């Protein structure tokens, strides 16, 4: 089975907790704080493994959670950073954020890496909070939570040439005679439902990878007939070979097929029209093919170069392969999105918080609910088992303007305020 799209969950490791500790050595009066910081949580890193060809492995494991950092220790010892969690993906994998649709990484070359979920930083130990007025603080931070998200993995086949056209126009047959690939060939539509790859060698010692892509139908750009799953593979090809059935045995008009397929490519991704396209008139060994070809040429004009072939008898195939090889040599690769810098094989996704720092809503029972990335992160990093940490959290809330915002919403002494799953009383 060929798996070309899958949804998975990734979570960076939480940072280790900071420690509250003090020096107790002999001959060290008033030893002072000695709590170490927690270690950084591990990142979830995707790495390209050239030996992989599908996303099949993700059918069986869809949750990837990196290890948290080691907790801080006494005597000022910091916790150890956890080893990053490496997730192997095949070349041609595009990683998208499931919620926003943003492309996080486009992984194409062996060994290329991308950080998909960052681990949290370690919490600070009490030695970090010592001041002239508070030389022995009873306060330490919990580790920062690691980033978590659902991501969509899409595999777009890496091929120099893509064969496109309606079902049963002879794409699989053509691939089978020009390469050692053995795609399934039968007398019914959609025999090919997954891409087939073959290495083509020309007579002058040139070679390229050709992909037999599943047949397209009208409305494919809108998802009709699994159109989105088929069209995504064309985005990586450098040259498009448009195969048209000139026999007319299917009852379709070759020119209408030509126009329909090109419209589908344009509607799906306008940039596909920038790629060189070779028009192949197939099944020229059939009785009415020559007459249909002449009518087709009259409609498309002299600007479109047409290669009449018969994939079955191999008539015209040699000239076609030479033309395709020439186009590949003069055509650059087309990235699927704008690339800022390709000088490094590593990609770092920089996470930026979105939206407001906090939001306040009120439930039907009068409880005030505070939410937002910043306040929830601050809450999770607070050690509520220590009074000094609780007082610090209260100061942080005031500094963020939450107290003032609660008063503006009508909060009074004794009202219940909720953050995540925890409730406490509002004191004015």
From Swiss-Prot:
Cofactor(s) listed in the protein's UniProt record: Mg(2+)
Any one Gene Ontology cellular component term annotated for this protein: cytoplasm
Complex and partners: Monomer.
Domain OCT: 350-428
One Gene Ontology term of the molecular function aspect: magnesium ion binding
Domain Obg span(s) in chain numbering: 1-158
PANTHER family per UniProt: DEVELOPMENTALLY REGULATED GTP-BINDING PROTEIN-RELATED (PTHR11702), MITOCHONDRIAL RIBOSOME-ASSOCIATED GTPASE 2 (PTHR11702:SF31)
Class of the enzyme per the UniProt entry, highest EC level: hydrolase
PROSITE patterns membership: G_OBG, GTP1_OBG, OBG, OCT
Similarity remark: Belongs to the TRAFAC class OBG-HflX-like GTPase superfamily. OBG GTPase family.
Coiled coil: none
Localization, UniProt: Cytoplasm
Gene that this polypeptide is encoded by: obg
Annotated protein name in UniProt: GTPase Obg
Positions bound to Mg(2+): 172, 192
Record's function text: An essential GTPase which binds GTP, GDP and possibly (p)ppGpp with moderate affinity, with high nucleotide exchange rates and a fairly low GTP hydrolysis rate. Plays a role in control of the cell cycle, stress response, ribosome biogenesis and in those bacteria that undergo differentiation, in morphogenesis control.
Domain of life: Bacteria
Residues involved in GTP binding: 165-172, 190-194, 212-215, 282-285, 310-312
């Amino acid at each position: 089975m060929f798996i070309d799209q899958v949804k998975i969950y990734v979570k960076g490791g939480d940072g280790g907790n900071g420690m509250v500790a003090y020096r107790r050595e002999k001959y060290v009066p008033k030893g002072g704080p000695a709590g170490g910081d927690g270690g950084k949580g591990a990142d979830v890193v995707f790495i390209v493994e050239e030996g992989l060809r599908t996303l099949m492995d993700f059918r069986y494991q869809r949750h990837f959670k990196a290890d948290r950092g080691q907790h801080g220790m006494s005597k000022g010892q910091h916790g150890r950073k956890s080893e990053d969690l490496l997730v192997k993906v095949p070349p041609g994998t595009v990683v998208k954020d499931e919620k926003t649709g943003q492309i996080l990484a486009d992984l194409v070359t062996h060994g290329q890496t991308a950080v998909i979920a960052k681990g949290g930083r370690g919490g600070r130990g009490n030695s970090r909070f010592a001041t002239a007025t508070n030389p022995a603080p009873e306060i330490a931070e919990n580790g920062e939570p690691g980033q978590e998200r659902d991501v969509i993995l899409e595999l777009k086949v890496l091929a120099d040439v893509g064969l496109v056209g309606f079902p049963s126009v002879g794409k699989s047959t053509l691939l089978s005679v020009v390469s050692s690939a053995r795609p399934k060939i039968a007398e019914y539509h959609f025999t090919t439902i997954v891409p087939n790859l073959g290495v083509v060698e020309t007579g002058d010692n040139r070679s390229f990878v050709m992909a037999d892509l599943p047949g397209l139908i009208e409305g494919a750009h809108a998802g009709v007939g699994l159109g989105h799953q088929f069209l995504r593979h064309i985005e990586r090809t450098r040259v498009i070979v448009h195969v048209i059935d000139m026999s007319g045995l299917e009852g379709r008009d070759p020119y209408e097929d030509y126009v329909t397929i090109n419209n589908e490519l344009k509607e799906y991704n306008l940039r596909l029209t920038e790629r060189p396209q070779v028009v192949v008139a197939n099944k020229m060994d059939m009785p009415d093919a020559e007459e249909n070809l002449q009518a087709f040429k009259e409609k498309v004009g002299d600007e479109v170069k047409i290669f009449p072939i018969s994939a079955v008898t191999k008539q015209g195939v040699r000239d076609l392969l030479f033309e395709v090889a020439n186009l590949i040599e003069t055509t650059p690769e087309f990235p699927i999105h704008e690339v800022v810098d390709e000088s490094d094989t590593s990609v770092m996704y920089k996470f930026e918080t979105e939206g407001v720092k906090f939001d306040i809503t009120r439930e039907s029972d009068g409880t005030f609910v505070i939410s937002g990335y910043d306040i929830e992160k601050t809450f999770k990093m607070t050690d509520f088992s220590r009074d000094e940490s609780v007082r610090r959290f209260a100061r942080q809330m005031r500094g963020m303007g939450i107290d003032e915002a609660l008063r503006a919403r009508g909060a009074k002494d004794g009202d219940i305020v909720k953050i995540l799953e925890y409730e406490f009383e509002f004191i004015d």
